[in-house]
Amino acid sequence: MKKILAVIGLLFLMVACSSTEEVKSSGSREKIYRTSTNQTTVRNIGKFQVDSSTYISRGKEERIKFIILHYTALDNVGSIRELTGGVSAHFLVLDEDDNKIYSLVPLEQRAWHAGVSAFRGRTNINDTSVGIEIVNDGIAKEYRSDPNPYHPYDHYVDYKPIQIEKVAQIIKYVAEKYNIPARNIVAHSDIAPSRKKDPGAKFPWKELYDKYNI
């Protein structure tokens, strides 16, 4: 009988060790949440092991909150040159009928696309956004010398359907990955209205909604 009880006790301990535990820190009323020891993942820093799963902090959030759309106001060559220099974006969609989307900056890193910006109580939107640059002239060249800063719809350049399809797929991928709501998928002109117009009056926001459910 003693052997049976000992076995039952051992099984109980094994089950307890395989589940999430709530540990009270000594001398404090705070609670520490600890995950299973048998699910621990370990890597090394120098000669020391780093345990990244036994104790998990709940005080965290995703960096990426917004998706910002831009036009480059340059041709393909100029856009590539500009966006591989000091200015950058996470994705570049060229003015070409092909199946390529260019990733210029990894999503986990910050790109320099927003500039001085603010939106929904946040500033410096580079810190919390993914930037998508689309090769498009923006304002047609014959109207760029117009001193009036406000251009009518006809002054803007159309986007190619393939570009919009690519942009839609990027948005859907990033929004799903980081749980970004539609209200946070915005124009450069939304976060810097006093100095930016892109992606311009001819960017088909309604098409994104109607055709791609964005």
Label for each model-derived stretch:
Residues 31-179:
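Active-site-adjacent loop/helix surface patches within enzyme catalytic domains
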Residues 1-2, 23, 46:
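Generic cytosolic/nucleocytoplasmic N-terminal low-complexity/intrinsically disordered segments
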Residues 17-18, 24-27, 35, 51-52:
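Intrinsically disordered, low-complexity segments enriched in Ser/Pro/Gly/Ala and basic residues
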